[in-house]
C-alpha cells in the first residue's frame, strides 16, 4: 500500500486555485503519465473523487490510498497568503475536507511546518480536523516545530494534543523525533 497525502500535501486532489500550478509541477516532476497511462502530464480531475475514479478507470501498478492535505486545500481556497481565513473561506475548506473524506480519503493531514500550513492558526485546524472527527477519520500532523524555530517541540506536541481534544479527532504525530 502506498499512502499519499502526508504532511498536508495531497497533490492529487482537491485541485483548485493556487494548488493547480503547484500540483501540476509535482505531477510533471514525477511522471503521472506512466502511472496513470495519461497521454500528457496534465491533471484531468479537480476533486478527490474524480482522482480516485481516474485511478480506477486508468489502472495503477500501485495500491494507492491517500489522506486529504490541509496545505493543498488551503492553497486552493486562500492561496499562499499569510492570514486567517474568512468565514466563507473556512466554510469552503470544510466542504472540501468533507467531500474528500466522503470520496475515500483515509484522513486529514497537516504540514504545519511548511507554507501554507504554517500560516494556519490552531483554531483553523481544530475546525477542519473536526470534520474528520465527525466521519471517524484520522488526523495526522507534521507538527509546527520539531526544534526551537517557532513554538518548540513541546509546544508543537501540546498543540497537536489540543487539536485532538478540541475537535474530538484521533491524532497521529508524524516524524516525532
What kind of region is each of these model predictions?
Residues 1-106:
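Divalent-metal coordination cores built from histidine and acidic residues
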Residues 49-52, 56, 84-110, 116-177:
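Histidine/acidic residue-rich metal-binding segments in metalloenzymes
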Amino acid at each position: 500500500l502506498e499512502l499519499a497525502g502526508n504532511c498536508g500535501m495531497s497533490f492529487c486532489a482537491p485541485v483548485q486555485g493556487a494548488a493547480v500550478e503547484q500540483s501540476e509541477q509535482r505531477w510533471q516532476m514525477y511522471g503521472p503519465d506512466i502511472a496513470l497511462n495519461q497521454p500528457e502530464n496534465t491533471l484531468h480531475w479537480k476533486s478527490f473523487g474524480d482522482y480516485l475514479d481516474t485511478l480506477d478507470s486508468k489502472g495503477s501498478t500501485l495500491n494507492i490510498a491517500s489522506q486529504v492535505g490541509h496545505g493543498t486545500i488551503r492553497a486552493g481556497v486562500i492561496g499562499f497568503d499569510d492570514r486567517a481565513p474568512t468565514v466563507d473561506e473556512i466554510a469552503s475548506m470544510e466542504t472540501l475536507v468533507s467531500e474528500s473524506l466522503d470520496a475515500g480519503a483515509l484522513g486529514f493531514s497537516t504540514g504545519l511546518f511548511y507554507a501554507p500550513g504554517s500560516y494556519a492558526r490552531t483554531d483553523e485546524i481544530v475546525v477542519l480536523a473536526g470534520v474528520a472527527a465527525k466521519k471517524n477519520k484520522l488526523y495526522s500532523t507534521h507538527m509546527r516545530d520539531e526544534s526551537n524555530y517557532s513554538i518548540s517541540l513541546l509546544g508543537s506536541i501540546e498543540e497537536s494534543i489540543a487539536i485532538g481534544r478540541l475537535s474530538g479527532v484521533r491524532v497521529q504525530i508524524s516524524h516525532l523525533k
